[in-house]
Curated annotation (Swiss-Prot):
Pfam families: FMN_dh. This is L-lactate dehydrogenase. The active site is at H275 (proton acceptor). Its main location: membrane. Catalyzes the conversion of L-lactate to pyruvate. Is coupled to the respiratory chain. Keywords: Cell inner membrane, Cell membrane, Flavoprotein, FMN, Membrane, Oxidoreductase. InterPro entries: Aldolase_TIM, Alpha-hydoxy_acid_DH_FMN, FMN-dep_DH, FMN_HAD, FMN_hydac_DH_AS, LldD. It comes from Acinetobacter baumannii (strain SDF). One of its GO terms (cellular component) is plasma membrane. It comes from the Bacteria.
Amino acid sequence: MIISSGNDYRAAAQRRLPPFLFHYIDGGAYAEYTLKRNVQDLSEIALRQRVLNDMSALSLETKLFNETLSMPVALAPVGLTGMYARRGEVQAAMAADKKGIPFTLSTVSVCPIEEVAPAINRPMWFQLYVLRDRGFMRNALERAKAAGCSTLVFTVDMPVPGARYRDAHSGMSGPNAAMRRYMQSVFHPHWSWNVGLMGRPHDLGNISKYLGKPTGLEDYIGWLGSNFDPSISWKDLEWIREFWDGPMVIKGILDPEDAKDAVRFGADGIVVSNHGGRQLDGVMSSARALPAIADAVKGDLAILADSGIRNGLDVVRMLALGADTVLLGRAFVYALAAAGGQGVSNLLDLIDKEMRVAMTLTGAKSISDINTDCLVQAIKQGL
Protein backbone atom coordinates (compact mmCIF):
# COMPACT_ATOMS: atom_id res chain seq x y z
CA MET A 1 0.00 0.00 0.00
CA ILE A 2 1.36 3.44 -0.96
CA ILE A 3 1.23 5.94 1.90
CA SER A 4 0.92 9.54 0.73
CA SER A 5 -1.43 11.13 3.28
CA GLY A 6 -2.68 10.84 6.83
CA ASN A 7 -5.83 9.10 5.58
CA ASP A 8 -3.64 6.38 4.07
CA TYR A 9 -2.27 5.60 7.53
CA ARG A 10 -5.82 5.14 8.80
CA ALA A 11 -6.55 2.63 6.03
CA ALA A 12 -3.29 0.80 6.69
CA ALA A 13 -4.01 0.67 10.43
CA GLN A 14 -7.43 -0.83 9.79
CA ARG A 15 -5.87 -3.62 7.75
CA ARG A 16 -3.18 -4.38 10.32
CA LEU A 17 -5.08 -4.14 13.61
CA PRO A 18 -7.62 -6.54 15.14
CA PRO A 19 -11.04 -4.85 14.89
CA PHE A 20 -11.37 -4.27 18.64
CA LEU A 21 -8.26 -2.09 18.62
CA PHE A 22 -8.99 -0.25 15.39
CA HIS A 23 -12.52 0.66 16.43
CA TYR A 24 -11.37 1.65 19.92
CA ILE A 25 -9.19 4.42 18.49
CA ASP A 26 -11.43 5.18 15.50
CA GLY A 27 -14.79 5.36 17.26
CA GLY A 28 -16.65 7.94 19.30
CA ALA A 29 -19.57 8.23 21.69
CA TYR A 30 -23.18 7.33 20.95
CA ALA A 31 -24.06 7.98 17.26
CA GLU A 32 -20.67 9.65 16.69
CA TYR A 33 -22.22 12.92 15.51
CA THR A 34 -19.56 15.05 17.20
CA LEU A 35 -16.80 12.76 15.96
CA LYS A 36 -17.90 13.44 12.39
CA ARG A 37 -18.41 17.17 12.92
CA ASN A 38 -14.91 17.57 14.34
CA VAL A 39 -13.43 16.58 11.00
CA GLN A 40 -16.10 18.08 8.76
CA ASP A 41 -16.21 21.52 10.39
CA LEU A 42 -12.46 21.90 10.04
CA SER A 43 -12.44 20.76 6.42
CA GLU A 44 -15.15 23.29 5.52
CA ILE A 45 -13.13 26.29 6.70
CA ALA A 46 -11.82 28.03 3.59
CA LEU A 47 -8.29 29.40 3.64
CA ARG A 48 -7.65 32.80 2.05
CA GLN A 49 -5.06 32.50 -0.70
CA ARG A 50 -2.54 35.35 -1.02
CA VAL A 51 0.34 35.45 -3.52
CA LEU A 52 3.57 37.32 -4.42
CA ASN A 53 4.64 37.84 -0.80
CA ASP A 54 8.25 36.52 -0.86
CA MET A 55 7.84 33.51 1.44
CA SER A 56 11.48 32.39 1.26
CA ALA A 57 12.09 32.95 4.99
CA LEU A 58 9.17 30.91 6.37
CA SER A 59 9.43 29.40 9.88
CA LEU A 60 7.22 26.96 11.81
CA GLU A 61 9.12 27.34 15.08
CA THR A 62 7.23 28.50 18.17
CA LYS A 63 7.59 28.66 21.95
CA LEU A 64 5.28 27.24 24.59
CA PHE A 65 5.85 27.02 28.36
CA ASN A 66 9.50 28.04 27.85
CA GLU A 67 10.00 25.18 25.40
CA THR A 68 10.97 25.63 21.76
CA LEU A 69 8.85 23.56 19.36
CA SER A 70 9.89 22.94 15.75
CA MET A 71 6.22 23.36 14.83
CA PRO A 72 3.07 24.14 16.87
CA VAL A 73 2.10 20.50 17.35
CA ALA A 74 2.33 18.11 20.30
CA LEU A 75 1.33 14.46 20.47
CA ALA A 76 -1.81 14.08 22.58
CA PRO A 77 -2.28 11.61 25.43
CA VAL A 78 -3.86 8.43 24.05
CA GLY A 79 -4.67 5.48 26.29
CA LEU A 80 -3.33 2.05 25.35
CA THR A 81 -0.93 3.43 22.73
CA GLY A 82 1.35 0.50 23.54
CA MET A 83 -1.25 -1.88 22.10
CA TYR A 84 -0.94 -0.34 18.63
CA ALA A 85 2.77 -1.06 18.23
CA ARG A 86 5.37 -2.84 20.32
CA ARG A 87 6.09 -0.53 23.28
CA GLY A 88 4.15 2.05 21.33
CA GLU A 89 4.47 4.95 23.76
CA VAL A 90 8.26 4.73 23.57
CA GLN A 91 8.22 4.63 19.77
CA ALA A 92 5.86 7.60 19.50
CA ALA A 93 7.81 9.60 22.08
CA MET A 94 11.04 9.01 20.19
CA ALA A 95 9.43 10.19 16.95
CA ALA A 96 8.16 13.36 18.63
CA ASP A 97 11.57 13.94 20.21
CA LYS A 98 13.28 13.56 16.83
CA LYS A 99 10.90 16.15 15.35
CA GLY A 100 11.41 18.56 18.22
CA ILE A 101 7.88 18.55 19.64
CA PRO A 102 6.39 17.34 22.96
CA PHE A 103 4.96 13.89 23.60
CA THR A 104 2.20 13.54 26.21
CA LEU A 105 2.02 10.27 28.13
CA SER A 106 -1.46 9.09 29.12
CA THR A 107 -2.34 8.00 32.64
CA VAL A 108 -3.51 4.72 31.10
CA SER A 109 -0.46 4.02 28.96
CA VAL A 110 1.00 0.55 28.51
CA CYS A 111 4.55 1.78 29.06
CA PRO A 112 5.09 3.45 32.45
CA ILE A 113 6.56 6.91 32.99
CA GLU A 114 9.87 5.36 34.02
CA GLU A 115 10.20 3.51 30.70
CA VAL A 116 9.29 6.38 28.38
CA ALA A 117 11.07 9.37 29.95
CA PRO A 118 14.65 7.99 29.67
CA ALA A 119 14.12 7.12 25.98
CA ILE A 120 13.94 10.76 24.87
CA ASN A 121 16.03 13.91 25.27
CA ARG A 122 13.39 16.59 25.78
CA PRO A 123 11.05 16.53 28.80
CA MET A 124 7.75 14.84 28.06
CA TRP A 125 4.34 15.98 29.22
CA PHE A 126 2.13 13.86 31.49
CA GLN A 127 -1.67 13.60 31.42
CA LEU A 128 -3.74 12.92 34.53
CA TYR A 129 -7.42 12.26 35.24
CA VAL A 130 -9.28 13.10 38.44
CA LEU A 131 -9.87 9.72 40.06
CA ARG A 132 -11.42 8.60 43.33
CA ASP A 133 -8.10 7.09 44.36
CA ARG A 134 -6.25 10.27 45.35
CA GLY A 135 -3.32 8.14 46.48
CA PHE A 136 -2.79 7.06 42.89
CA MET A 137 -3.03 10.64 41.66
CA ARG A 138 -0.41 11.82 44.15
CA ASN A 139 1.83 8.87 43.30
CA ALA A 140 1.56 9.58 39.57
CA LEU A 141 2.36 13.27 40.06
CA GLU A 142 5.40 12.49 42.18
CA ARG A 143 6.68 9.95 39.65
CA ALA A 144 6.10 12.32 36.75
CA LYS A 145 8.03 15.04 38.54
CA ALA A 146 10.86 12.64 39.42
CA ALA A 147 11.08 11.55 35.77
CA GLY A 148 11.48 15.15 34.63
CA CYS A 149 8.07 15.69 33.02
CA SER A 150 7.74 19.39 32.29
CA THR A 151 4.00 19.97 31.85
CA LEU A 152 0.88 18.45 33.39
CA VAL A 153 -2.14 18.01 31.13
CA PHE A 154 -5.13 17.63 33.43
CA THR A 155 -8.17 16.08 31.72
CA VAL A 156 -11.46 17.35 33.16
CA ASP A 157 -14.08 16.20 30.63
CA MET A 158 -14.24 12.64 31.88
CA PRO A 159 -15.97 12.60 35.29
CA VAL A 160 -17.80 9.57 33.90
CA PRO A 161 -16.86 7.48 30.85
CA GLY A 162 -18.77 8.16 27.64
CA ALA A 163 -21.01 5.55 26.04
CA ARG A 164 -18.96 4.16 23.15
CA TYR A 165 -21.26 1.73 21.42
CA ARG A 166 -18.67 0.70 18.86
CA ASP A 167 -16.60 -0.89 21.61
CA ALA A 168 -19.40 -3.33 22.44
CA HIS A 169 -19.76 -4.31 18.79
CA SER A 170 -16.03 -4.70 18.20
CA GLY A 171 -15.14 -6.78 21.26
CA MET A 172 -13.34 -4.18 23.35
CA SER A 173 -16.22 -4.58 25.79
CA GLY A 174 -19.54 -6.40 25.93
CA PRO A 175 -20.46 -10.12 26.03
CA ASN A 176 -17.62 -12.63 25.52
CA ALA A 177 -15.22 -9.76 24.88
CA ALA A 178 -12.05 -11.68 25.79
CA MET A 179 -12.89 -14.57 23.46
CA ARG A 180 -13.81 -12.21 20.63
CA ARG A 181 -10.53 -10.34 21.01
CA TYR A 182 -8.60 -13.61 20.94
CA MET A 183 -10.32 -14.80 17.77
CA GLN A 184 -9.71 -11.47 16.04
CA SER A 185 -6.03 -11.63 16.95
CA VAL A 186 -5.69 -15.05 15.31
CA PHE A 187 -6.62 -13.50 11.97
CA HIS A 188 -4.09 -10.67 12.36
CA PRO A 189 -0.81 -12.58 12.71
CA HIS A 190 1.50 -9.59 12.20
CA TRP A 191 -0.04 -7.75 15.14
CA SER A 192 -0.28 -10.95 17.20
CA TRP A 193 3.45 -11.62 16.83
CA ASN A 194 4.86 -8.12 16.91
CA VAL A 195 2.64 -6.64 19.62
CA GLY A 196 0.57 -9.45 21.10
CA LEU A 197 3.58 -11.65 21.86
CA MET A 198 6.75 -9.56 21.57
CA GLY A 199 5.18 -6.40 23.01
CA ARG A 200 4.52 -7.86 26.43
CA PRO A 201 3.81 -7.02 29.20
CA HIS A 202 0.38 -5.74 28.22
CA ASP A 203 -0.48 -4.12 31.49
CA LEU A 204 -1.14 -0.49 32.34
CA GLY A 205 2.33 0.47 33.46
CA ASN A 206 1.50 3.56 35.50
CA ILE A 207 -1.29 1.82 37.40
CA SER A 208 0.65 -1.43 37.87
CA LYS A 209 3.53 0.47 39.44
CA TYR A 210 1.12 1.89 42.00
CA LEU A 211 -0.90 -1.24 42.70
CA GLY A 212 2.17 -3.47 42.74
CA LYS A 213 0.63 -6.05 40.42
CA PRO A 214 -0.06 -6.44 36.69
CA THR A 215 -3.20 -4.79 35.33
CA GLY A 216 -4.48 -6.21 32.06
CA LEU A 217 -7.19 -5.00 29.70
CA GLU A 218 -10.06 -6.28 31.82
CA ASP A 219 -8.52 -4.64 34.88
CA TYR A 220 -8.14 -1.43 32.88
CA ILE A 221 -11.83 -1.28 32.07
CA GLY A 222 -12.90 -2.26 35.58
CA TRP A 223 -10.44 -0.06 37.48
CA LEU A 224 -11.20 3.04 35.45
CA GLY A 225 -14.93 2.43 35.58
CA SER A 226 -14.86 2.34 39.37
CA ASN A 227 -12.46 5.25 39.80
CA PHE A 228 -13.82 8.08 37.69
CA ASP A 229 -15.07 10.79 40.01
CA PRO A 230 -18.23 12.77 39.12
CA SER A 231 -17.65 15.04 42.13
CA ILE A 232 -14.74 16.77 40.36
CA SER A 233 -14.60 20.54 40.93
CA TRP A 234 -12.11 23.40 40.85
CA LYS A 235 -11.13 22.45 44.41
CA ASP A 236 -9.54 19.27 43.03
CA LEU A 237 -7.26 21.39 40.87
CA GLU A 238 -6.23 23.37 43.94
CA TRP A 239 -5.31 20.06 45.60
CA ILE A 240 -3.21 19.07 42.59
CA ARG A 241 -1.32 22.36 42.77
CA GLU A 242 0.01 21.21 46.13
CA PHE A 243 1.95 18.46 44.35
CA TRP A 244 2.70 20.06 40.97
CA ASP A 245 4.50 23.38 40.59
CA GLY A 246 5.15 23.22 36.83
CA PRO A 247 2.94 24.35 33.96
CA MET A 248 -0.61 22.96 34.18
CA VAL A 249 -2.90 22.68 31.17
CA ILE A 250 -6.62 21.97 31.65
CA LYS A 251 -7.90 19.72 28.87
CA GLY A 252 -11.57 19.51 27.93
CA ILE A 253 -12.73 23.14 27.69
CA LEU A 254 -15.57 23.95 25.25
CA ASP A 255 -17.22 27.00 26.83
CA PRO A 256 -15.82 30.53 27.25
CA GLU A 257 -17.02 30.69 30.86
CA ASP A 258 -15.01 27.58 31.74
CA ALA A 259 -12.03 29.13 29.97
CA LYS A 260 -12.40 32.26 32.11
CA ASP A 261 -12.57 30.07 35.23
CA ALA A 262 -9.31 28.43 34.13
CA VAL A 263 -7.71 31.88 33.97
CA ARG A 264 -9.00 32.73 37.47
CA PHE A 265 -7.68 29.42 38.75
CA GLY A 266 -4.23 30.26 37.42
CA ALA A 267 -3.91 27.57 34.77
CA ASP A 268 -1.04 28.02 32.35
CA GLY A 269 -3.05 26.71 29.43
CA ILE A 270 -6.25 25.04 28.27
CA VAL A 271 -7.04 22.50 25.58
CA VAL A 272 -10.20 23.29 23.63
CA SER A 273 -11.39 19.72 23.22
CA ASN A 274 -14.41 17.43 23.19
CA HIS A 275 -12.21 14.38 23.81
CA GLY A 276 -12.19 13.58 20.11
CA GLY A 277 -15.95 13.06 20.15
CA ARG A 278 -15.55 10.21 22.63
CA GLN A 279 -17.46 11.67 25.60
CA LEU A 280 -20.66 13.69 25.04
CA ASP A 281 -22.07 13.27 21.55
CA GLY A 282 -23.87 16.33 20.25
CA VAL A 283 -21.55 18.99 21.67
CA MET A 284 -19.89 21.51 19.37
CA SER A 285 -16.83 20.61 17.41
CA SER A 286 -13.61 22.09 18.76
CA ALA A 287 -13.31 24.24 15.63
CA ARG A 288 -16.69 25.86 16.30
CA ALA A 289 -16.00 26.33 20.02
CA LEU A 290 -12.52 27.78 19.59
CA PRO A 291 -13.19 31.33 18.26
CA ALA A 292 -15.40 32.40 21.18
CA ILE A 293 -12.95 30.94 23.68
CA ALA A 294 -10.05 32.73 22.00
CA ASP A 295 -12.00 36.00 22.13
CA ALA A 296 -12.54 35.49 25.86
CA VAL A 297 -9.06 34.48 27.07
CA LYS A 298 -6.47 34.98 24.31
CA GLY A 299 -3.31 36.33 25.90
CA ASP A 300 -4.29 35.28 29.43
CA LEU A 301 -3.06 31.72 29.02
CA ALA A 302 -1.91 29.35 26.27
CA ILE A 303 -4.71 27.98 24.08
CA LEU A 304 -4.25 24.49 22.69
CA ALA A 305 -6.83 22.62 20.63
CA ASP A 306 -7.51 19.07 19.50
CA SER A 307 -10.26 16.91 17.97
CA GLY A 308 -10.59 16.49 14.21
CA ILE A 309 -7.05 17.46 13.18
CA ARG A 310 -5.86 15.12 10.44
CA ASN A 311 -3.31 17.12 8.42
CA GLY A 312 -1.22 20.26 8.23
CA LEU A 313 -4.04 22.30 6.72
CA ASP A 314 -6.15 21.52 9.79
CA VAL A 315 -3.31 22.71 12.02
CA VAL A 316 -3.22 26.04 10.19
CA ARG A 317 -7.01 26.34 10.44
CA MET A 318 -6.94 25.79 14.21
CA LEU A 319 -4.17 28.35 14.63
CA ALA A 320 -6.12 30.85 12.53
CA LEU A 321 -9.15 30.34 14.77
CA GLY A 322 -7.13 31.20 17.87
CA ALA A 323 -5.06 28.22 19.02
CA ASP A 324 -1.39 28.63 19.92
CA THR A 325 -0.60 24.94 19.46
CA VAL A 326 -2.56 21.79 18.58
CA LEU A 327 -2.58 18.27 19.97
CA LEU A 328 -2.51 15.38 17.52
CA GLY A 329 -4.20 12.17 18.71
CA ARG A 330 -5.86 9.64 16.39
CA ALA A 331 -3.70 10.66 13.43
CA PHE A 332 -0.44 9.65 15.08
CA VAL A 333 -1.89 6.40 16.43
CA TYR A 334 -2.98 5.39 12.92
CA ALA A 335 0.58 6.02 11.70
CA LEU A 336 2.05 4.15 14.67
CA ALA A 337 -0.17 1.12 14.06
CA ALA A 338 0.63 1.11 10.35
CA ALA A 339 4.39 1.63 10.46
CA GLY A 340 5.64 2.01 14.03
CA GLY A 341 7.76 4.93 15.14
CA GLN A 342 8.94 5.53 11.58
CA GLY A 343 5.32 5.97 10.55
CA VAL A 344 4.88 8.67 13.21
CA SER A 345 8.06 10.40 12.03
CA ASN A 346 6.84 10.30 8.44
CA LEU A 347 3.44 11.68 9.44
CA LEU A 348 5.01 14.58 11.35
CA ASP A 349 7.22 15.40 8.36
CA LEU A 350 4.13 15.31 6.14
CA ILE A 351 2.27 17.70 8.45
CA ASP A 352 5.33 19.97 8.41
CA LYS A 353 5.26 20.07 4.60
CA GLU A 354 1.50 20.61 4.47
CA MET A 355 1.78 23.51 6.91
CA ARG A 356 4.53 25.11 4.82
CA VAL A 357 2.41 24.93 1.69
CA ALA A 358 -0.61 26.41 3.49
CA MET A 359 1.44 29.20 5.08
CA THR A 360 3.18 30.03 1.81
CA LEU A 361 -0.12 30.37 -0.03
CA THR A 362 -1.85 32.36 2.73
CA GLY A 363 1.06 34.76 3.19
CA ALA A 364 1.92 33.74 6.78
CA LYS A 365 5.70 33.81 7.21
CA SER A 366 5.66 32.75 10.86
CA ILE A 367 3.31 31.08 13.32
CA SER A 368 2.46 34.48 14.80
CA ASP A 369 1.26 35.58 11.34
CA ILE A 370 -1.46 32.92 11.29
CA ASN A 371 -4.74 34.54 12.31
CA THR A 372 -8.27 35.10 11.04
CA ASP A 373 -6.87 37.09 8.11
CA CYS A 374 -5.79 33.71 6.72
CA LEU A 375 -9.45 32.66 6.45
CA VAL A 376 -12.09 33.64 3.91
CA GLN A 377 -14.28 36.33 5.48
CA ALA A 378 -17.62 34.58 4.92
CA ILE A 379 -16.42 31.40 6.57
CA LYS A 380 -14.77 33.33 9.39
CA GLN A 381 -18.05 35.09 10.20
CA GLY A 382 -20.02 31.86 9.85
CA LEU A 383 -18.16 30.28 12.71
